[in-house]
Regions:
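Membrane-interface micro-motifs in multi-pass membrane enzymes
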Residues: 33-34, 105-117, 237, 266-270, ...
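Membrane-interface helix caps and helix-loop-helix hairpins in membrane proteins
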Residues: 23-32, 152-153, 319-324
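Extracytoplasmic catalytic-loop and juxtamembrane helix elements of membrane-embedded
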Residues: 84-102, 199-217
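Alpha-helical transmembrane segments of multi-pass inner-membrane proteins
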Residues: 13-23, 38-43, 59-99, 105-173, ...
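Hydrophobic alpha-helical transmembrane segments
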Residues: 270-282
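Transmembrane alpha-helices of multi-pass inner-membrane enzymes
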Residues: 179-184, 299, 303-356
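Transmembrane signal-anchor hairpin modules in multi-pass inner-membrane enzymes, especially those
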Residues: 1-20, 26-33, 53-63, 128-138, ...
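Long extracytoplasmic/lumenal interhelical loops at the membrane interface
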Residues: 198, 205-220, 224, 228, ...
Length: 356
């Protein structure tokens, strides 16, 4: 018997709409692989949600996710120290920032690495606050430190904004009064962070930066395209996007996607898909917030907060990039939704499985 979280009906509906969008794509052959993979990853959330049956399994999964995030971040730091890996000229405006090195780690793109770390860092923070002995506190502190350093090295402004918002939500849930210290924290960071990071952050919204103006032109072209295709979209994948978008592009800008998750969902499967996606997220957040309010166990409350803040921060960065373009990030997003659904009912799970 499958367990159904409140969001699951919308999850199934979203998968069905996305499959229909794939079938009716302007280029079915070009959309088929990406569309089917996306549907499979969406439904993986249901599988994961029903595979974890005890609190011990769930807690072990949480620990493994923090360790995996730390390993990925550590590899990214090594890339920076030893100059490993590929660097693309499209990742930064060389005229504004010079010859900067942005770490992609195993995600092949620093923005996608930032998306992943936004999900992982709140789990590490929850583990740090929930730890009951100094050994585990030091362990989680080191994990959080490694992931935060790697986040800085991505030089991803969207990811930084997403992480700041995730931190805001995290503190808002647990100790709202600490938000009064935010101005002092920001001033302190100004004196501690390297100039490269400060300059990069200060350039947010500067249309003189080619990557910013590039995104704005893509959004304008995408909105112009959606005036004609808002109902059913054009189908998922860059093949469908590149078949239609060039007719609407501004300044001849070439792009594989809309550089905005919400715009891209409408491109892939129409406005109904976006409405269902928003409803899915609404039920995800509502379920976790309700569980947080009635939960008495501090451990569960901490990780429920991490699940809310991680996805909230992820969605902030998703406004500046198409997060699901990288299939690993796509799979992780749906896995995190399943994780949130599990954490919402952690108190109802048995401590261990029944012995047979």
């Amino acid at each position: 018997k499958l367990y159904y979280a409140p969001m699951n009906r919308y999850l199934w509906l979203y998968a069905a709409i996305y499959l229909a969008g794939t079938w009716f794509s302007v280029t079915r052959a070009g959309s088929l692989l990406g569309g089917v993979l996306t549907v499979a990853f969406i439904l993986f959330a249901v599988i994961l949600e029903n595979s974890i049956t005890t609190r011990r399994q769930l807690d072990t999964l949480l620990l493994l996710l923090v360790m995996a995030g730390t390993a990925v971040a550590l590899y990214g730091i090594c890339q920076y120290l030893f100059g490993w890996g590929y660097q693309s000229a499209a990742w930064a405006d060389s005229e504004m920032f010079g010859d900067v090195f942005r770490v992609p780690s195993t995600l092949e793109n620093p923005n996608m690495l930032g998306q992943y770390l936004i999900l992982a860092i709140p789990l590490g923070g929850a583990g740090l606050l929930a730890a009951k002995d100094w050994g585990m506190r030091v362990f989680y502190f080191c994990c959080c430190g490694v992931m935060c350093v790697c986040m800085l090295l991505t030089l991803s402004r969207g990811a930084w904004l997403g992480l700041l918002f995730a931190g805001f939500v995290f503190v808002l849930f647990l100790q709202p009064r600490l938000l009064l210290l935010t101005p002092l924290l920001l001033v302190g960071l100004y004196f501690v962070l390297p100039d490269a990071v400060i300059n990069r952050f200060a350039s947010i919204g500067n249309l003189g930066d080619s990557s910013t103006s590039y995104r704005v032109y893509i959004w304008m072209g995408t909105l112009a395209m959606l005036k004609d295709y808002w109902m059913c979209g054009i189908g998922p994948g860059d093949a469908a996007f590149n078949l239609v978008y060039p007719k609407y592009s501004y300044s001849g800008i070439v792009a594989p996607h809309a550089h905005n998750l919400f715009l891209q969902i409408v491109c892939d499967a129409g406005v109904v898909a976006l409405v269902v996606f928003v409803l899915l997220l609404f039920h995800y957040f509502r379920d976790l917030c309700a569980a947080f309010c009635r939960e008495k166990d501090p451990f569960s409350r901490l990780y429920q907060t991490a699940a809310v803040s991680g996805i909230a921060g992820f969605l902030v960065q998703a406004m500046t990039d198409y997060s699901f373009y990288n299939y690993r990030v796509l799979l992780l997003f749906w896995a995190w939704l399943a994780l949130g659904a599990l954490l919402a009912r952690r108190g109802q799970l048995p401590e261990r499985g029944l012995k047979v």
